[in-house]
Amino acid sequence: MKPIIVSVAGPSGAGKSYLANILKQNHSFQEIVSTTTRAPREGEINGVHYHFIDKDSFLKLEEEGGLVEKTYVNGNYYGVSKSEPLRLAKENLPIVLVAEPEGVKQVQKFCKDNDWINVSIFVNSPIEVLIDRLQSRMKQELENVKKDDPQYEQKIKKITDSNIGRMNHIKEFELKNWVEPAYSKDSIFDLVFDEFNKKNEVDVINKVKSEISRKQKLEDNIKKTSKVKKNRIKPF
């Protein structure tokens, strides 16, 4: 069976990581751990949520051709090292990856170059839902900072600035550059969901699995057709 990568993209707060976690925890998917140059947030663990490295190390990895995809968002680099999918592919289980839309294009190229199957998904939500989720996330992060922490003020400011930056990024960039193209006739995505939450969770998961099956069958048919044509060629 060909390796499968399911790429999940969408605006901040749409539920990309939530979908990836469900596929991983309940449906035997493996999740790629991305690499980033941004600092860890409260509660994030190196090697679990991200591989946290400095800018020079990231750029060196890129220069050596060691990245599947990379993006630059809010002053930080994000990417996936080639070693991650190649390692996970040995387990013969589908792989899920959360990426920005530009990163999805790069993953699609990686899959095409390596003869892998790719399913690209875009998860959206109404703008008011996105903002509400980010505000709730910010509130939770702020509550996790202990008041007796010597760096309390700095951490509060960092969390606040980061989340406000993400909210502004949604309004000023993501809606026009990510959401609108996802719904266009030239969309790069196989599946686009207007919203993802507990109410439609089962339906979304079923559609993702159906799309994987459809692409697997398509690959099988191509393989069979190629084999038949090969057998029809008579030697001179």
Where in the sequence are the language-model features?
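Small-molecule kinase domains that catalyze NTP-dependent phosphoryl transfer to phosphate-bearing small molecules
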Residues: 140-232
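Hydrophobic anchor at the beta1->P-loop junction of P-loop NTPases
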Residues: 8
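P-loop (Walker A) phosphate-binding loop of NTP-binding proteins
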Residues: 11
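Walker A/P-loop
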Residues: 17
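ATP-dependent small-molecule kinase phosphotransfer cores
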Residues: 38-103
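Conserved phosphate-donor/acceptor-positioning beta-strand/loop module used by diverse small-molecule
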Residues: 94-101, 114-138
